[in-house]
Amino acid sequence: MDMMGLAGTSKHITFLLLCQLGASGPGDGCCVEKTSFPEGASGSPLGPRNLSCYRVSKTDYECSWQYDGPEDNVSHVLWCCFVPPNHTHTGQERCRYFSSGPDRTVQFWEQDGIPVLSKVNFWVESRLGNRTMKSQKISQYLYNWTKTTPPLGHIKVSQSHRQLRMDWNVSEEAGAEVQFRRRMPTTNWTLGDCGPQVNSGSGVLGDIRGSMSESCLCPSENMAQEIQIRRRRRLSSGAPGGPWSDWSMPVCVPPEVLPQAKIKFLVEPLNQGGRRRLTMQGQSPQLAVPEGCRGRPGAQVKKHLVLVRMLSCRCQAQTSKTVPLGKKLNLSGATYDLNVLAKTRFGRSTIQKWHLPAQELTETRALNVSVGGNMTSMQWAAQAPGTTYCLEWQPWFQHRNHTHCTLIVPEEEDPAKMVTHSWSSKPTLEQEECYRITVFASKNPKNPMLWATVLSSYYFGGNASRAGTPRHVSVRNQTGDSVSVEWTASQLSTCPGVLTQYVVRCEAEDGAWESEWLVPPTKTQVTLDGLRSRVMYKVQVRADTARLPGAWSHPQRFSFEVQISRLSIIFASLGSFASVLLVGSLGYIGLNRAAWHLCPPLPTPCGSTAVEFPGSQGKQAWQWCNPEDFPEVLYPRDALVVEMPGDRGDGTESPQAAPECALDTRRPLETQRQRQVQALSEARRLGLAREDCPRGDLAHVTLPLLLGGVTQGASVLDDLWRTHKTAEPGPPTLGQEA
C-alpha cells in the first residue's frame, strides 16, 4: 500500500489502519516498517514508567510497566523496534506493537518475530482520549535478561536468637540474589538484603525433593511482622542477570515475646471426695497484625492452652496434661503449677504462670505410723476396690526435692477395710523432725488430673516426748496470791496438729497442795493463783500429743513472797512528806506565838493608850527635835521640864541632866493623872504639842522620860494625845517650868 497516497492523514492513524489489514500474532501485535515516531518521553508526570522486558522461560518473554494517571478509558500499546537479522547491512529497523488495553503486562514468544539474541528497543504509549503519553525507551537483549520467580511454595519460618530464618525451595539453579521487605502494624515497609545464595553460610541448604533450597535471615521483633521475598538472577561475574522478581506472598510471623495473659483462676475448697473445682475466667490477649496479615494464618495465636502439672506424687507415670483454656477442672489437694500457653507457628509459648498450693482436708483422718529399727509402717482406711494409692512424705519446711513417694496397688482387699504399707529401707521416719504425709487415690493413675486426696496428716518422728519437752521455764510474781509461768514453745508446735495441749503442774514441796493447768498449744504462758506466801513451790510443764503424753520439764522452784505494790509505796511516801510538812508548819507557828509572848514588842507612844510614869520622878520632859515644824525661825533647842508638885518618895533626883523630867510613880494614880493633864495644858499654851504625829510613829518627836525604873501605863499617854489640840504656830518658849 502506498502510504504517500494518504495525504493529510495522521501517521499514527495510518499505521493503525495498516496494522488492521495485516496479520496479527498471539500478542495481538503488528509488524511494520519504521516511520518517524517520537523519540523522547512525553515529559508529563503522568503516563507509563519503569518499563521492563525479560525472559520468563525458555521460549516465553514478558514486558511490564507501571502507569500513573486515570484508569478509565486508557489503553496501552507496547512498541518494539529492531533490525531484522537479514537486514543488518542496510540498518533498516522494523517495529512491532502489542496492544494490551488497560493491562500493564504483555507476553510474547519467539514466534511473534521479536529477536531475542539481538538488541531490541521497547517503549510504551498510553492513549487517553486524544492524548498520547510515552515512556522512556529501553534497549534489551531478551535472551540473557531473565526474570526469576519469587518463592511460590511454602516458606518455612523458624526463630532462634532473636532472628527469623526463612527457607524455601527453588526449581532453577542457585545463584540468585534475594531481598526481603517487612512491615509491622505501626511501621511502613523496610527493605533488607539476604545476600547472594551460594554454597556457604546461610545459602543453599541442599537438595530437597530434587530441588534446591534458599534461605534468608531477618531480625525478630516484639510485634507481628509481614515479610515478603523477591529474587534476581545473578551472573557468574556478579553482575545482575535480570530484573527483580515479583514479591512473594506475605509471610506472617508472630512477635518474639507474646503479651501476657490476664486469666483469673477461682478455686473452691476441697469437697468430701478430696477434690476441688478450678474455674478460669478472662480472655486471651489479641495481637495487632499488619494489613497484609489480616485474615491470614501465621501472625495470630492459633489457640490457647493450659498446662496442668502436678508437683506432688512425682512417682506417677505422667505428671502433666494440657487442656483447652477455659475448661473447668477438678483437682486434688496436691500442689500444682498451671501455665497458660499460646500456640503459634513457632510452637507453644508461656504467657502466664499460676501456682496452686496444696490444700489439706478439713476433717482429721486417722493415720497410724509406727517406726521400729529400719522398718516403717503406715495404715489408713481403704477406698473402693481397684484404687491405686500414692503415698508421699517429706520433711516439713524443706524443699520438695526431699519428697519421697511410692505407688501402692493392693493385690487383695483387706477384710478390715484398711491399707497397710511397710518398707524396711531408708528413708525412715525415725529422725526427730516433722513430716508431712499425704495419701492420694485414683482409679486412673495415668491421668494426673484424676487423683483425689484421701488423707493428709503430720507426724513427728523419733522420740516426740523427749523432743517436745518445753525449755526455759520461768516464774514471775504477778499479784498478791498468783504468779505467771512462761516457757518457750515446744518443738512439737512446728508440726501442725501434733501438739494438742500443754500441762502445767504446780505443787508445794511439803506435799500439802498440788494442781495442774491445761493450756492450749498456741499459748506459752499461764497464771497460777491461790498460792500462799512463804511456801516453797515447784512448777513443771509438759507437751502432750494425741498419741501419748509428753515428758515433764526440769522443775522450777520458787518461794512466793507478798510484795507491796508500787502504788502503795508512792502513797506512803506522799503521806510521810505531807506529815513532815504539816508538823514543820505547826512547829513554826507555835514558836512564833511563844516568842511573841516571851518577848513582846516595845510600845509605841503614838499608838499606846496610856503611859505610866514612876511616882518617884517629879519631872516629865518632852523634846521635839524636828526643825521642819518651824521653817521661818530657828531657836536654840531646849527640853521642856515639867515639875510636879508633891512629896518625893526618896528625895533623890534622876541622874539625867537638867532638861530631863522625873515623875513620881509612888503617888496615887489619880494624882498622877491630874498632873499629866496640867502638864499637857501647859504644853498647849507653849505651842509645843503637835497633832501631826501619826499614832505609833515617834520618828519626829523625841520624848526622853526619866522613869526611874517604873513605867507608867500606856493609857495615860493615850489620854494626853486624845485631848491635844493643834495650836497656832509661833515661836516656842523654852525652859518654862510648870
Swiss-Prot record:
Disulfide bonds join C53-C63. A motif (Box 1 motif) lies at residues 598-606. Glycans are attached at N50, N73, N86, N130, N144, N169, N188, N330, N368, N374, N401, N463, N477. InterPro entries: FN3_dom, FN3_sf, Ig-like_fold. It is a single-pass type I membrane protein. It is found in: Membrane. Residues 20-565 are extracellular. It comes from the Eukaryota. SUPFAM superfamilies: Fibronectin type III. GO terms for cellular component: external side of plasma membrane; interleukin-23 receptor complex; plasma membrane. Belongs to the type I cytokine receptor family. Type 2 subfamily. The WSXWS motif appears to be necessary for proper protein folding and thereby efficient intracellular transport and cell-surface receptor binding. The box 1 motif is required for JAK interaction and/or activation. Dimer or oligomer; disulfide-linked. Interacts with IL12RB2 to form the high affinity IL12 receptor. Heterodimer with IL23R; in presence of IL23. The heterodimer forms the IL23 receptor. This is Interleukin-12 receptor subunit beta-1. The lineage of its organism: Eukaryota, Metazoa, Chordata, Craniata, Vertebrata.
